[in-house]
Amino acid sequence: MADISIPGVTDKYKTNDLIKNLMEAERVPLTREQKQLETYKTQQETWRNVNTQMTYVRESVRSLYSFDNPFSSKLASSTDEYAVSATPKRDAALESFKVEVLQTATADRFLSAELDAKMQVPAGNYEYAVNDKKVSFNWKGGKLSDFVAALNRRSANTIKASIIGISKDKQALLIESLITGSENRLTFSGAARDFALQTGMIGKAPAAAQDSFTIKRDTIRNADNLNSKTVEFSQDALTVPPRSGFESPIPQKIAAEKTKTIRFNVRAIDIPAEEVLPDKPELPSAGTVSFKDVTLSNEEFDTKLPLSEETEKVPAEPVEDYAAVFVKAADGTEIPLGPLKPNGENTSYSIAASDYPGMSALVIKNNNTHKKIVMTKPETIDMAASSGYIPLNPAETAADAKIKYQGITITRPSNTIDDVVPNVTLNIQAKTEKPATISIEPDKKAAKEALITFVGKYNRLMAELNILTQTKPEIITELEYFTEDEAKAAEKRLGMFQTEFSLANGKRALQTITSGRYPTADDAQITMCRKSGISTSASTSGFTGVSASRLRGYLEIDEKKLDAAPQSNMQDIKNLFGYDSDGDLVIDSGIAFAIDKNLQSFTQIGGIIASKTSTLNTRISSSQKNIETLESKLKRKEQDLKTKYGQMEASLNSLEKQSDSITNFSDNQRSGR
C-alpha cells in the first residue's frame, strides 16, 4: 500500500524546509526594519534619560540661587539649650545676643482634694472658660471617668481634665488650661463652680488686705538728684514736673506674696514754654513807690555774682527721656520697666511680685525739660483670685513668660516669642541660671550638602554625555561607581550620539561655565568655582601631569577648602552661584544661573530633546506601519507557497498512485500467464 502523504504533516518531500528557506530570504527587509525600530526606541529612551539627568542638574542648580537657597539658611545655638533656644528666619542677622529667662509662661492647673474612687459627678450645666474661650455642656450625671472623657471631647485646645490615682480608693481631679499667660485665667461657672467648690478645687477668696500699695507724700523721697517735693497729688493721679522724681517704698507684705500685682498707667505730656522752670535763679523786682505823678524805683539787687558769658549766651539743651519707670530691688539695683509712649498716650505697667522677688520700691524719674509725667494711683490685685474664688490646690497658676533682653525686661503670654529679636523666634523652656548666649550663624552644613549634591548630579550628566558622544571604552571603566549591569547598559549606548553636535556643544558649554570667573563685589574673595574647593583637579595640589579622566569635565571636591570657604565667605559663595548684577532683584549671573539657562534649551517644551524625541516618534510610527505591511505580505507569501507546494505534493502523490496501479496491473497480468 502506498504511503499516505498529508501536506504539512508527513512532509514527505521536505516542502516545509523549502518554504522556510524561501521565507527567510523574504524576511530580510522585515528583520532590517525591526532592528531599525529597536534602534529608534533605544535612541528615544536614551534622549529621555538625558532629559532626566539634565532636569536633575537644573533642579540642583536652581536650589543654589533661588529664594530658598542654602546659603541664606541660618542656624541658632544656645549656651543653655534646655532653657532657651531660637529658630532664625532666612533674613535674621548674623549676631550673638544674651537672653535671660526669668520666668516661663504657664497656664492654670488646679487639683481637687482627695476624692473617693467611686464618686459620682452630679448632673447640671457645666461651664468652663479661659479668657474669652468657653466650654459648656449639659451633663446628665455619672462616673467621674465618664465626666472627664465628656469634657475632653468638647474642650480641644482650651482645657484638659485628667484623673490622678492617689491610692486604691482615692483619686484627684486635675483640670488645666491649655493656654498660657496671666490674662488667660481658668474660671468656673454654673454647675462647674459648684462641683469645684464641692471637690475642694477652689474656695472663696479672703477679704482684700488693707495694706495695699499706695503712694503718699510723707513716704516718698528723692530719686537720685531729682526733687520729690515738687510732685503734685490729686484725687486720682500724681503729676511729676520736669526735672523731678520720687521713690516710694513697696510694703514687704505685698512684695512677699507672689500672687500680688501692682498696676498703674503713666503718660508724658508736653507743657507750654511759659511753664518750663528757669535754668537759673530769678530775683524778684526791687519794687517802686508812687505819689501823685511821681514814681520812685528801688535800686536793683546786687548779688555780686556776675553771670559768665556761656550762661548768658547758651540756653539749656532740651532733654527727652522716656525711661521713667523703675523697680528698685533689695540690693538697690534699679530695673527699667520699659519706655513711655512718645505720643502722650497712656503706658500700662504691671509689677508682679513673682517677677521681682525682693522688690523694695517704685521709682519714677522725669529727666525731661519740657514734659510732665502723669501717673494714675496704683491698684494692688491678687491674681490668684478669679471672680471671688481662688484655687485651693494649684499645681500651677497662669503667668506670662518673662525674659531680659538688652537689659530690658520683657513679658509675653506665650513661651514662643517672635517679636523681640528681628526675624528670630525664641523658644522658652525653663528659667536660666545666668544669661544664655544665642548665636545666629550660617547653616554651613546645608550649604555643603547642596554643593555636594550639585557636583554628584553634574558628574552623572557629564558621564552620560561622554558615553553618548565618544566611543572610547575607558570612559566606562573609569566610572568606578557603575554596577556591572549599569556598565553593560552603558556599553550599548557608547558612541550612540557621536554625531550629535548639540550634545557635544552642550558639554563644552558646561565645562566653560564651571571654569569661568564671576566677579561680584570688589572685595570678593571667591570669584571662581575652584576657590570654593570644587574643580576638575580639586583632589590634587600642584601640577601632576595630564590625566585623561580630568579632561572629560568631571568635577572634584577638595573637602578641606569646601569646609573652610563658608566659614568666612558664605556671601561670596552665594554670589558665585547666583548674583543680581544690575540691582533689579532678579538673579542674572553666576554658575548655577548659567548652567540652568544652558540646560533650559535642552529640556524646555519645544527644546532640543523634545524635538529629537518628536522626530523619533514619527520614525517609530512609520517603522511600525512598515513592519505591519511587511508582516502582512510575508503571511500572504507564506500561505501562497504552502498552497502551491501542497498542490504540487498532491499531484506527485496522484502520479505515484497511478504509477503504483500500472505496476500492480502489469504484475497481475504476468502472474496470470
Curated annotation (Swiss-Prot):
Any one of the GO CC terms: bacterial-type flagellum hook
Membrane-spanning parts: none
InterPro entries reported for this sequence: FliD, FliD_C, FliD_N
One annotated GO biological process: cell adhesion
Disulphide bridges: none
Main location per the UniProt record: periplasm
Biased composition (Polar residues): 650-673
Residue numbers spanned by region Disordered: 649-673
Record localization: Periplasmic flagellum; Periplasm
Coiled-coil residue windows: 611-664
Superkingdom as given in the UniProt entry: Bacteria
Binding partners and assembly: Homopentamer.
NCBIfam families: PRK06664.1
Function: Required for the morphogenesis and for the elongation of the flagellar filament by facilitating polymerization of the flagellin monomers at the tip of growing filament. Forms a capping structure, which prevents flagellin subunits (transported through the central channel of the flagellum) from leaking out without polymerization at the distal end.
Family: Belongs to the FliD family.
Protein name: Flagellar hook-associated protein 2
Species this chain originates from: Treponema maltophilum
